[in-house]
C-alpha cells in the first residue's frame, strides 16, 4: 500500500504528547441505542457535544463514534447531516454479528438524499483497524482499547506509533482526530468515490430495552411530553437547552438511551435461577442485591430528568409547562389501576364472547377469541376488509413465552461470531431449574361492554373489556402475571381502535421469559424494488414499501430493506409519527381489492418483532398444561417471535425465529407484528429479572390501530 500520510487515532481522551494532537470529542455524549430516542432528543445529544466544542474552542466534531453496540439505524443520517456531522464510526462488540458492509463506505438515506461516511469494524472496537480508500494517500489507524479496559498508557501509544512507522516506512505517521482524517479524504476526492450503501442496518442488541419495561415506558413518556411542549410553546422555549433547567433535564433524559443499564453481574452466578433460589440469593448471596441496585440507579435518571425541571422557578415558562406535561405522561404509565367492571355503577355490561359484534358505526364485524382473549375478526365498513388474520384468533392477544437453555444455544450458534454462553445465554439453567419451551395463552374468564356516552352519535368510543387468567404454575414457578386485562375502544368517528393491556401481579423471575401482544394482520402486499430519492434538503415522496414500514427518529424505513446480518426482525419503533404510526403495512384488500393500510402505534413498549406468517405452524388452543406452540409441533417453528435480529438457517426445532442471511421476505400475503412487553433474555447489560422494585408488579401498555 502506498501511504503518504497515516493518521493515528487513539480514542477521545488518552493521548501521547510526542505523537498525538490535543484531545477532541466525538459527536454524541456516549454509546447509545439511538432507536430508543426520538428525533428531537437524539439531536439534542449531538448539540451537547457541539456546545462543548464551542466552549473549549475546538472545531465541531464531524464524526459520531459508537463502540460495543453492533449497529444503529439509518434514521440517524438526516439528523446528523442537519448538524454538520459528516461521518460515523462503529466498533461492534467482538462476539456479535454486524451488518455486512465495507470497512468504509458512504451510507445514504434515500428519502432525504443525505449521507454520511460510515466506518465499521465488525470484529471489535478497532484496536488494529487501518482504513484506506481508493486513490487516496491518506489512511487511518485506530487504537481503541477493549471493553471496560480504560485508555492506553503513553508508553503503549508510543510503542504503537513506532510499530506503524516501521510497518509503513514511506508514510508520515502522525496523531489524528476524527475530523482530520475525514477532512483529508474529502479534500482529495476519495470520499466521493466510496462504495454506497442505502439499506437499514439496525441494532441487534435492542431486544434488551424491554428488560426494564417501566424505564422504557417512562422514557417514552418524557419524550412525548417534550414534543407536546415544543408543539405548544416552540423549540426556543421548550427544546434542547432552552433554559438551564431544560438543558439539565435533557442531559438526564438522554442517559435513558445509554446502552448499558447497570452492573454486568449475572454471568457470575449459574445456580440461582428458580424464583425460590433468586429470593434466597437476593438476601444472602454477595452481588445479587448490589447488581439490582445498579439497575435502580440507571432507572433513577427518570426521576433526575423530572427533578431538574422541578428545580426551575416559575419564571421559566418552558420548564414549568414541560414539568406539567411530563408528570401527566408519567402518571399514565405508573402503577396502573386494575379495572373493576363488576363494581356497582361501573357502567359495564356482561358480554358473550362467542357473539359477533355487528352494530359498531365504523366496523361491520368484530369477532372475539372466546377461549384465550383477543380478536378473531376485524372488518371495517368502508373497506370491507378483515384486518385480523383470524386463524387462531390471536389478534391483540397477550401471550407468555418460556424458554430452555437449548433455545439459547441455538440462538448463539446462529447469531454470534464466537460462542459466548455466559453473556448471551443461560448457562447451567438445565441443571438448576425445570423449564419448558413454549408459548402460553391464558383463559378468558370474563368480558364486558360499555356503550359510548354520546349514544348513537359519531362521538366517543364503544368499549369492550376482557379478563384473561393465567395458569397458576406459569404465575408461581415462572414470571407470568396472575391475570391480564385488555381494553378495546372502538371509535365511532373513524376506523380506529385504542387498546390497553394491563398486567396484574407479575412474578419476579430469573427464568427466561417474554411477554407479547400479537398483531397478526391480513394485508396482501406486492413486491416492489423501486427506490425514490429526493434532492439535498428536500425529502422525496416515501418509496412504496412491500413490507412493514417502521417509524424511527422521524423517518419511515422499510423492514424488507435491511442489510445482510443487520437487524431484520427486531426493531425499536417510535410513537412520534402521527401519519404512519409506529409500524404500518399497506396493500390490497376487501371485495374490490382496494388499497388498505394497517397502522399500529405502540406508546409504552418500544420493541417490535416481525415474522412472516406463511411459515408459521398453526396455533392450536389447548389446555394450559401445554403451550400454544412447542418444539414437538413441527420440524421447524419459523415464526414464533423471539428477540433475534436475523436468520442464518431455517431447519432447527426451536422457539427462536432462526436468523436468516437474507432480507425479510417480500410480498407475503400476511405477516405478524409482535410487540414485546417484557423479557429477560440478555444476561449482560440489562436487568435479569423483573420486577426488581416494589410497586412494579402491575404494568400497562397502550396501542392504537388506524385502519384505512
Regions found by a protein language model. Give the residues of each.
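Catalytic-domain carbohydrate-binding cleft regions of carbohydrate-active enzymes
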Residues: 1-301, 455-622, 627-708
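Catalytic and substrate-binding regions of extracellular carbohydrate-active enzymes
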Residues: 243, 247, 255-503
Amino acid at each position: 500500500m502506498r501511504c503518504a500520510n497515516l493518521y493515528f487515532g487513539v480514542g477521545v481522551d488518552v493521548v501521547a504528547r510526542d505523537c498525538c494532537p490535543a484531545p477532541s470529542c466525538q459527536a454524541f455524549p456516549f454509546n447509545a441505542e439511538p432507536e430508543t430516542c426520538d428525533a428531537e432528543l437524539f439531536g439534542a445529544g449531538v448539540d451537547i457535544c457541539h456546545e462543548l466544542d464551542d466552549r473549549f474552542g475546538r472545531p465541531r466534531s464531524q464524526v459520531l463514534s459508537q463502540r460495543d453496540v453492533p449497529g444503529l439505524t439509518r434514521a440517524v443520517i438526516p439528523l446528523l447531516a442537519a448538524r454538520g456531522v459528516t461521518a460515523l464510526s462503529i466498533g461492534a462488540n467482538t462476539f456479535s454479528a454486524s451488518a455486512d458492509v465495507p470497512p468504509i463506505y458512504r451510507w445514504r438515506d434515500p428519502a432525504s438524499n443525505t449521507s454520511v461516511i460510515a466506518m465499521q469494524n465488525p470484529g471489535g472496537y478497532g484496536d488494529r483497524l487501518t482504513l484506506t480508500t481508493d486513490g487516496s494517500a491518506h489512511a487511518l489507524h485506530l487504537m481503541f482499547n477493549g471493553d471496560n479496559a480504560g485508555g492506553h498508557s503513553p508508553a503503549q501509544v508510543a510503542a504503537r506509533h513506532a510499530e506503524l512507522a516501521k510497518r509503513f516506512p514511506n508514510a508520515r505517521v502522525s496523531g489524528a482526530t476524527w475530523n482530520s482524517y475525514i477532512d483529508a479524504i474529502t479534500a482529495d476526492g476519495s470520499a466521493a468515490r466510496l462504495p454506497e450503501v442505502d439499506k437499514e442496518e439496525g441494532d441487534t442488541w435492542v431486544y434488551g430495552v424491554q428488560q426494564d419495561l417501566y424505564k422504557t415506558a417512562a422514557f417514552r413518556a418524557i419524550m412525548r411530553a417534550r414534543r407536546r411542549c415544543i408543539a405548544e410553546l416552540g423549540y426556543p422555549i421548550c427544546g434542547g437547552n432552552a433554559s438551564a433547567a431544560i438543558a439539565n433535564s435533557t442531559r438526564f433524559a438522554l442517559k435513558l438511551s445509554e446502552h448499558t443499564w447497570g452492573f454486568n453481574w449475572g454471568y457470575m452466578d449459574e445456580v440461582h435461577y428458580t424464583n425460590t433460589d433468586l429470593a434466597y440469593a437476593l438476601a444472602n448471596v454477595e452481588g445479587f442485591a448490589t447488581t439490582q441496585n445498579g439497575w435502580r440507579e440507571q432507572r433513577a435518571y427518570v426521576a433526575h430528568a423530572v427533578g431538574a425541571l422541578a428545580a426551575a422557578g416559575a419564571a421559566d415558562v418552558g420548564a414549568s409547562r414541560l414539568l406539567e406535561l411530563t408528570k401527566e405522561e408519567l402518571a399514565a404509565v405508573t402503577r396502573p389501576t386494575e379495572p373493576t367492571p363488576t363494581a356497582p355503577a361501573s357502567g359495564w355490561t356482561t358480554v358473550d364472547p362467542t357473539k359477533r359484534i355487528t352494530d359498531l358505526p365504523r366496523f361491520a364485524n368484530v369477532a372475539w377469541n372466546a377461549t384465550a382473549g383477543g380478536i378473531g375478526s376485524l372488518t371495517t365498513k368502508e373497506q370491507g376488509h378483515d384486518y385480523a388474520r383470524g386463524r387462531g384468533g390471536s389478534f391483540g392477544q397477550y401471550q407468555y413465552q418460556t424458554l430452555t437453555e437449548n433455545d439459547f444455544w441455538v440462538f448463539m450458534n446462529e447469531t454470534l461470531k464466537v460462542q459466548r454462553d455466559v453473556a448471551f445465554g443461560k448457562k447451567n439453567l438445565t441443571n438448576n431449574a425445570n423449564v419448558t419451551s413454549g408459548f402460553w395463552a391464558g383463559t378468558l374468564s370474563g368480558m364486558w361492554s360499555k356503550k359510548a356516552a354520546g349514544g348513537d352519535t359519531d362521538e366517543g368510543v364503544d368499549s369492550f373489556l376482557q379478563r384473561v387468567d393465567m395458569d397458576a404454575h406459569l404465575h408461581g414457578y415462572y414470571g407470568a402475571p396472575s391475570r391480564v386485562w385488555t381494553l378495546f375502544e372502538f371509535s365511532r368517528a373513524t376506523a380506529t381502535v385504542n387498546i390497553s393491556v394491563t398486567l396484574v401481579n407479575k412474578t419476579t423471575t430469573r427464568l427466561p421469559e417474554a411477554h407479547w401482544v400479537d398483531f397478526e394482520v391480513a394485508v396482501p402486499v406486492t413486491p416492489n424494488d423501486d427506490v425514490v430519492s429526493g434532492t439535498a434538503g428536500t425529502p422525496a415522496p416515501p418509496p412504496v414499501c412491500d413490507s412493514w414500514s417502521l417509524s424511527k427518529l422521524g423517518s419511515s424505513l422499510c423492514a424488507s430493506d435491511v442489510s445482510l446480518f443487520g437487524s431484520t426482525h427486531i426493531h425499536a419503533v417510535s410513537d412520534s409519527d402521527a401519519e404512519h404510526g409506529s409500524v404500518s403495512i399497506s396493500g390490497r384488500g376487501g371485495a374490490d381489492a382496494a388499497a388498505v393500510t394497517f397502522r399500529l402505534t405502540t406508546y409504552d413498549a418500544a420493541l417490535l418483532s416481525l415474522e412472516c406468517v406463511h411459515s408459521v405452524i398453526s396455533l392450536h388452543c389447548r389446555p394450559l398444561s401445554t403451550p400454544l406452540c412447542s418444539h414437538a409441533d413441527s420440524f421447524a417453528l419459523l415464526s414464533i417471535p423471539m428477540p433475534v435480529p436475523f436468520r442464518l438457517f431455517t431447519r432447527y426445532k426451536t422457539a427462536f425465529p432462526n436468523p436468516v442471511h437474507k432480507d425479510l421476505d417480500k410480498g407475503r400475503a400476511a405477516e405478524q407484528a409482535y410487540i414485546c412487553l417484557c423479557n429477560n433474555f440478555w444476561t449482560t447489560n440489562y436487568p435479569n429479572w423483573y420486577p426488581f422494585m416494589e410497586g412494579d408488579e402491575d404494568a400497562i401498555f397502550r396501542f392504537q390501530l388506524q385502519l384505512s
